């Protein structure tokens, strides 16, 4: 892609998200979401591969439907209440419809079906943008509209996303689909606590972005898209395979890695709110996600020669990619747990 075109598209991504962040009017927030969608569509379709074009078409149709629903709901709310304020959704019908539209935007269960299929058709870097940056603007709107939304709906969305994200990832062999279901499960953890402690949602979102960035960038360096290609990574690059293993375990939420921090804080908050059943269900759904991360770790570290492998080994060539983003994201993914008290002080 032409570097000038790429610069314009990336600037538009930043502009759309910033516009949604800073707006208190539904029309401006909607415009920011649409700028985001229109900016990422050319990035998704740049490969000119049938799978990429199919994924782009699916993404565009789903996002257009969600945007139409947001515009319709905000207009209906303005007609009923006489205000366009983002935080002013007094009616249960409009607030529920808006929550489902935003859930469709970010791929929360049960509106999640498009996300694995779209992510599977993209290359890893575009998939990284879709899994991280594109979640920011809708999540900002969800945080602002939470106070007027029925708590039962938020709890149901959170449990369903965590459960489906863990359960559906168990039988996957494609790494991008596994990361898509991982994204759905992490979004469930954010939604479950958003009504009680929005600052914990922000912490969970931040750690998720760093962990997912580390996972995508590591797989990009390893040129891995399926589980059976991970089996040759240890002989090819032992250090990178060890780093990738720790990143996956961090995504699974094992201590003493960063991924344990949001799960620990969220379970603690749910227990404080006298919701032991919800906390227990969320802790059990985390085990489902942990299982398929352990599958990836097993493929990378324990399935080495002379064992039988089902994929041809790759030549080990010197990478020309910039390793700074990978280094930063891996460092944050592994070492943020001791800073938990400081992070809590900064966000509360």
Curated annotation (Swiss-Prot):
GO molecular function: NADH dehydrogenase (ubiquinone) activity
Keyword Cytoplasm appears in the UniProt entry: no
Keywords noted in UniProt: Electron transport, Membrane, Mitochondrion, Mitochondrion inner membrane, NAD, Respiratory chain, Translocase, Transmembrane, Transmembrane helix, Transport, Ubiquinone
Biological process annotations from GO: mitochondrial electron transport, NADH to ubiquinone; mitochondrial respiratory chain complex I assembly
Topological relation to the membrane, as annotated: Multi-pass membrane protein
Transmembrane segments: 1-21, 25-45, 60-80, 99-119, 124-144, 151-171, 178-197, 202-224, 239-259, 274-294, 326-346
EC number from the UniProt entry: 7.1.1.2
Pfam families: NADH_dehy_S2_C (PF06444), Proton_antipo_M (PF00361)
Subcellular location field: Mitochondrion inner membrane
Any single Gene Ontology cellular-component annotation: respiratory chain complex I
Signal peptide: none
Enzyme kind, highest EC tier: translocase
Keyword Protease: no
Catalytic reactions on record: a ubiquinone + NADH + 5 H(+)(in) = a ubiquinol + NAD(+) + 4 H(+)(out)
Superkingdom of this protein's organism: Eukaryota
Principal location listed in the UniProt entry: mitochondrion
Record-stated family: Belongs to the complex I subunit 2 family.
Assembly and binders: Core subunit of respiratory chain NADH dehydrogenase (Complex I) which is composed of 45 different subunits.
Function: Core subunit of the mitochondrial membrane respiratory chain NADH dehydrogenase (Complex I) which catalyzes electron transfer from NADH through the respiratory chain, using ubiquinone as an electron acceptor. Essential for the catalytic activity and assembly of complex I.
Database matches in PANTHER family: NADH-UBIQUINONE OXIDOREDUCTASE CHAIN 2
Protein's recorded name: NADH-ubiquinone oxidoreductase chain 2
Protein encoded by which gene: mt-nd2
């Amino acid at each position: 892609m032409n570097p000038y075109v790429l610069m314009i598209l990336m600037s538009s991504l930043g502009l759309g998200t910033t516009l949604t962040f800073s707006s208190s009017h539904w029309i401006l927030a909607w415009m920011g979401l649409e700028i985001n969608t229109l900016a990422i569509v050319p990035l998704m379709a740049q490969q000119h591969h049938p799978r990429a074009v199919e994924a782009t078409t699916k993404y565009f149709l789903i996002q257009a439907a969600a945007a139409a629903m947001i515009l319709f709901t905000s207009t209906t709310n303005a007609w009923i209440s006489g205000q366009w304020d983002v935080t002013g959704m007094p009616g249960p019908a409009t607030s529920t419809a808006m929550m489902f539209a935003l859930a469709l935007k970010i791929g929360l269960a049960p509106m999640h079906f498009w996300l694995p299929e779209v992510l599977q058709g993209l290359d890893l870097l575009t998939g990284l943008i879709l899994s991280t940056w594109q979640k920011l603007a809708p999540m900002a709107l969800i945080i602002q509209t939470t106070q007027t939304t029925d708590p039962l709906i938020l709890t149901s969305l959170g449990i369903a996303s965590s459960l489906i994200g863990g359960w559906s990832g168990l039988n996957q062999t494609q790494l991008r689909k596994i990361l898509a279901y991982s994204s759905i499960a992490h979004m469930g953890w954010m939604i479950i606590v958003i009504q009680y402690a929005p600052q914990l949602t922000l912490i969970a979102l931040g750690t998720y972005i760093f962990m997912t960035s580390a996972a995508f960038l590591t797989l990009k360096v390893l040129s891995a898209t399926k589980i059976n290609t991970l089996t040759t990574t240890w002989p090819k690059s032992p250090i990178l395979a060890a780093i990738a293993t720790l990143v996956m375990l961090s995504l699974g939420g094992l201590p003493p890695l960063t991924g344990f921090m949001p799960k620990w804080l969220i379970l603690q908050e749910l227990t404080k709110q006298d919701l032991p059943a919800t906390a227990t269900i969320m802790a059990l759904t985390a085990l489902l996600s942990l299982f398929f991360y352990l599958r990836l770790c097993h493929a990378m570290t324990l399935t080495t020669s002379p064992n039988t492998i089902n994929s041809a080994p790759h030549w080990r060539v010197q990478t020309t990619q910039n390793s700074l983003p990978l280094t930063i994201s891996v460092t944050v993914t592994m070492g943020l747990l001791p800073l938990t008290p400081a992070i809590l002080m900064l966000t509360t």
